[in-house]
Structure formats: structure tokens, C-alpha cells
Amino acid sequence: MNLLDYLPGVPDFPKPGVLFRDISPLLANPIAFKEAIHQLNEVAKQFDYTHILGIESRGFIFGSALAHFAHKGLALARKPNKLPLATHREAYGLEYGIDSLEIQQSTLPNDAKILLLDDVLATDGTLIAADKLIRSAGFEVIGAITLLEIGFLNGKQLLEQNGIRHQSVLKS
């Protein structure tokens, strides 16, 4: 099964010049979704981790399914002001402004070894911010995985320059 068949490109979304990969068809097909989680698990086996950090919002979908499948814990990296208790926060730049990620301070055990998970690796400020967030909170980041890597944007090289080991299921 070619999972890329279930990730159609939508040109000029959310802005001109961007080719957005829509995960909706993959999620709507139970066989394709199950295969995606199976393949993410195979990639994740390369890392010695105790918890997955799912990055808002599509990282929640894949992270929760993978955590269940792999019998691992799950923590959520949320946009600001979405968590009820005290948080750690990391700001990061986007091509059109600044955003932040937060994790609740009481979520993870002290010895947690974190595997970052997002759906797509693009440039990738989000995964770098998640890495900084987790490290500044005092936890160990083991690496990062994504379902899809958009190769020409060189996100993997940026992750490596920041000391983050990355693997993906698919590359386009």
C-alpha cells in the first residue's frame, strides 16, 4: 500500500506557493490509517523512548494511536492557553509571525525519554521548538519522527544541526 496515495497535495493552501498535504483521506480509510500507524511504529522502534510528545494538532492523532499501539505514554504540546495547569512554554518563529508551544508541567515523570511526533517535517521550526520545550522542562529528547518528510525544504538538515535525530515513514 502506497500511503502517499492517501495524502493528496492541495496547491496554494494555506497560502500561494504552498503544497499542503491533506491527511483526511488517510484518516478516513481504516486500512490506510492502520498501515500508517504500523509503519510509524516500525520507525519508532529505532528509538529507546518511554513517551511520545504529540504536537498540536495532527501530532495528537498519530501520537495517540501510536502510543496505544506501542504501549507508551503520551504528552501533548499545545498552542498557548489551552492547558489548565502551570506550563512550560517555548516561542518559535514562523514565516508569518511568532507562535508558541506549551506542555503542562505535571504531565511527565522525571525519567521520561521523549520521542517527538508530528505529521509532516517541512522546515521545521515546530519540531525544533518542541525539542527546546522538552529540554528546557528538564526531560531527555530521544529523537523525532514524522509520517511525511518534504525533502526539498531541508527540515531534516535543520533538525540535525540542532542535534535532533529524525526518521520519517514517507518522503516527498
Swiss-Prot record:
Family per record: Belongs to the purine/pyrimidine phosphoribosyltransferase family.
Key words, A-Z: Cytoplasm, Glycosyltransferase, Purine salvage, Transferase
Keyword Nucleus: no
Gene: apt
GO cellular component, one term: cytoplasm
Species per Swiss-Prot/TrEMBL record: Polynucleobacter necessarius subsp. necessarius (strain STIR1)
Its biological purpose: Catalyzes a salvage reaction resulting in the formation of AMP, that is energically less costly than de novo synthesis.
GO biological process, one term: AMP salvage
GO function terms (MF aspect): adenine binding; adenine phosphoribosyltransferase activity; AMP binding
Reactions the enzyme catalyzes: AMP + diphosphate = 5-phospho-alpha-D-ribose 1-diphosphate + adenine
Protein name as annotated: Adenine phosphoribosyltransferase
Compartment list: Cytoplasm
